[in-house]
Amino acid sequence: MSKLWGGRFEKTASDWVDAFGASIEFDAQLVLEDLEGSMAHVTMLGDQGILLKEEVTQILDGLQQLKQKALADELKFEVYHEDIHMNLEALLHEAIGPVAGKMHTARSRNDQVATDMHLYLKERVKEVIQLIESLQRELHAHASENVETIMPGYTHLQRAQPISLAHHLLAYFWMLERDKERFTDSLKRIDWSPLGAGALAGTTFPIDRSRSAELLGFNRVYPNSLDAVSDRDFILEFLSNASMLMMHLSRFCEELILWASEEYRFITVSDTFSTGSSMMPQKKNPDMAELVRGKSGRVIGNLMGLLTLMKGLPLAYNKDLQEDKEGMFDTVKTVQGSLSIMAGMMNELTFHPDVMKKATERDFSNATELADYLTAKGLPFREAHEVTGRLVKYCVDERLYLRELPITVFQTYSELIQEDVYHALTPEQAVARRNSYGGTGFDAVREQLKEASVCMSTMTYS
C-alpha cells in the first residue's frame, strides 16, 4: 500500500523507520478533535463551492460514522499510517471510497495538527479551572471552620509568629486564584484558529478561514500562515501555568507531609489517602501528598523539554514538533489527577487545633508582640527590638519562656513593661490584634473569607 504522500518516492521506508517516525501511539488522543476539525473544514469547502454538495454530504456522513466508532472505542489504528490524521483518512477511504481524498483539499497536516491541539487544550484548560475551583472550595470550607484556630507561623521553617490556621489555608486559596486567572487568560490565546494556513504559505483555493473558525468555536484566526503552523506558544503557556500550579500544590503537600509527622501532629491524613509499609507494621505514609510533590517535577520537566525543543527551530514546521504532544498530554493527566487527589484529601483531612495551639505556647513566637508592646509605650522600635532580643537571650539561658518571667525581671530591662504585658503575650492576643488588611487577626481573616466567597460566587465553570 502506498503512503498517502508517497507519489514522489521510489522506495518505501522500512518498518523500523515507520515505527520511529510514527506518532499514532500518542496522538490518537486527538481523534475527536481531528474529526471535528475535518467536519468544519469540509463544511467550509462546501460553502465555498470548492466541493460539491453531494461530496460534502458523503464525507460528513463518513466522518460521523468514524466519530461514533471513536466514541465506542472501536477504531483500529496502524503505525504504517503514521499519525491520527492519516489513519482517519485511510479509514474514511475504506468507508466511503475515493471521495475521501477530497477531504484534504486546501489543507496540510501542519495546520490540521495545530488545529487539533488548539481544540484539545481549549477544553482541557476549562477542566483544569473547574478542578482548581473544587480545591478552592475545600480550602475555603476548612478556613471558615478554623478562623480562631491558632497555629505557629514559620519563616526559615522556624517558629516566627502565631497565626490563624484559616489565614494559612487562605494563602493557598489565593495562590490557586492566581493560577485560575492565568489559565483563564490563556484561553484568549488558545482560542485562535490555524486552520486554512496550509503547510506554511496559505492556499490557492478560495477558502473562508473565518467560517471554519466559527464552526469550531474559535474567536479569531491567525493572521499569518507561517506563525499559525509553527506556533506552540499556547502549549508552552499551558505548561508554564501548569508548572506554577504544581509548584503551589507541591509547597502545600510539603507542609501537609510535615504536619502529619509525629514531630508536628498538626493533622491526620485519612486512611483513604495513605499507604503502609511492607516491612514496618506501624507506618502510615502520606503517599498521595508525596506523589503530588514528586509529580510537580515531571510537569516542570515537560515545560523545560518543549522550551528546549522550540528554541532552535526555524520557520515554519519541523518534524521536531511531533515531540510537542506527549509532554502536553502527560501534563494534562498529571495536573488533573493531582488536583482531584488534593481536593479529596482535603475533604477528609482532620486538623488538631489543640496540638497547634500548644505549639505556640512553648516558644518565642510572641517576641514580636513584646517589641510592639514596648513601641506602643513610646520606645522606638529599634530599641524595643534590642530590649526584646536581650530578654529572649535571658530566657534561653534560664530555660524559661517570656510569659514565665517575673515582672521584676521584665522591668530590669525596661521600666515601661507593666503587668498588662502577660495578656499581650498570649497567643490569642498575638493573633487577634493583627487586623491590618490581609493580616492574620480574626476580624481581618473573616473579611478575607468574605473576599474569597465573592471569588467563589463567580466561579467560571462550576
UniProtKB/Swiss-Prot annotation:
GO cellular component: cytosol
Pathway annotation from the record: Amino-acid biosynthesis; L-arginine biosynthesis; L-arginine from L-ornithine and carbamoyl phosphate: step 3/3
Catalytically driven reaction(s): 2-(N(omega)-L-arginino)succinate = fumarate + L-arginine
First-tier enzyme category under EC: lyase
Location(s), subcellular: Cytoplasm
Alphabetic keyword roster: Amino-acid biosynthesis, Arginine biosynthesis, Cytoplasm, Lyase
PROSITE patterns: FUMARATE_LYASES
GO BP of this protein: arginine biosynthetic process via ornithine; L-arginine biosynthetic process
Gene Ontology MF, one: argininosuccinate lyase activity
Domain of life per record: Bacteria
Pfam families for this protein: ASL_C2, Lyase_1
E.C. number: 4.3.2.1
Main location: cytoplasm
Xref: NCBIfam families: argH
Family: Belongs to the lyase 1 family. Argininosuccinate lyase subfamily.
Record-given protein name: Argininosuccinate lyase
Gene: argH
